[in-house]
Amino acid sequence: VDEEKIKNQRQRARKLGALKLDTLTKSISKPLRDVLKAYDYELAVLHPFEATLADLTVRARAKQGHQSLPEVLKAVNELRKSVLETGKRHAAAAKNATSKQEAIEATEAGFREVESLMLEGADVVLNLIDVQKALRKIPIVQLGMPTVVLVGAPNVGKSSIVRAISSGTPEVNNYPFTTRGMTLGHLQYEDWAEGQCQVMDTPGVLNRPDEERNEMESLTLASMLHLPTAVMFVLDLTGNSGALSSIENQIQIRNGLRARFPKRPWVDVISKADLPMDQEDPAVARAPAGALKVSVADGTGLADLEARVKEMLLDVREVLSAIGLAEGPGGRVEGEGSGG
C-alpha cells in the first residue's frame, strides 16, 4: 500500500510539475510570439508612406545608440526560444523524476531558471516597448486624401503659406526622428462631394544626392512619392534664406525634383513677394517661368494661389477616382514610380 501511495504521489508530482512549467513557458512565449507575428504582418501590409515613417523612426533611434528594429525583434525571439527550451528541459526532468521530491526540485529549478532568464532579458522587452512607443508617436496622415505638399529649401516660407491658405488653424505634426514639426492644414471645398483636402509643408531639402540626405529630407521625398500629392515648390529669391538655401541651390533643387516627378500637378511659387529680389544674384534670372509671386505679409497673389491649388487638387482627385482610390487607403499617383 505504501509503495502504491508513493508511486501515486510521484506521478502526481511529475504531472503537476510538467504542467506548471508548460503553463509558465507558454504564458511567456506565446505573447512574445504573437508580438513577433504582428510585426511581420504589419511591416508587410504597411502603406509605403507609413513604412517609410516607421523606417525613419527606427533609423533615427539606431543613430542615437539604440538597437535597430531587426536587432530588437531578433533579441525578443532569442529570449522566447530560451524560455521555451528551459521550460521544456525542466518539464522533461520533472516528468522523468524517480521520486516526488525530485519532481518538485526539477519544477522549482525550472521556475528559478525561467525567472532568471526574464530578469536578464528585461532590457530586451523594454527595448521592444520603447520601439512601440516611438512608432505610436508617428502622426497620422490621411493616406487617400488629395494633398498639396509644399517643398523647398529651408527657411523659404513654406509653413507661413500653409497657415495662410488653410481653411482652419493648421496642426503641427512632430515626428520622432526630427525636432522640426511639419505643419498640416486642411482645405474645405463646399462644392465637392468629399470636399476636404490636406496641405502640408515638408522639411527643407538641400542640394545634395539622395544618399547624403537626412531623415527630414527623406520624409519630404516620401510624401511626394507615396501620397496622392500635388506639389507647390516654394522659392525665396530675396537672398536672405542662408547659404544652404542660396538662390542657385534652390533652383537646382527645384529642377532636380521636377525632373524626378514630371507627372505631378505642380506650381512654382516665389514667396516673400513684398520684399525686393536679390537682383545682383544671376541665378534670379533662371527662376522658373510662370511662377506665382506670393506674399503672406500683404496678401499678394494668395487668391491666385488658392485657385491654382484647387485646380491641382481636382487633378489629383480625378486620378484617384480613375484608379479606384478616391475613398480608399491611398497610394501613389498612377503612372509614377520611384523615379517619377
Model regions and ranges:
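Conserved P-loop NTPase architecture
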Residues: 1-147
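Amphipathic alpha-helical transducer elements in NTP-driven molecular machines
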Residues: 18, 22-25, 181, 214-221, ...
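Conserved, well-folded catalytic cores of nucleic-acid-processing
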Residues: 82, 86-93, 131-138, 164, ...
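Switch I (effector-binding) loop of TRAFAC-class P-loop GTPase G-domains
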Residues: 141-143, 166-198, 206-219, 247
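Glycine-rich phosphate-binding P-loop
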Residues: 146-167, 180
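Active-site glycine-centered loops adjacent to acidic/histidine catalytic or metal-binding residues
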Residues: 201, 271, 295
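Conserved C-terminal guanine-recognition region of P-loop GTPase G domains, centered on the G4
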Residues: 217-290
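Canonical P-loop GTPase G-domain recognition
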Residues: 274-331
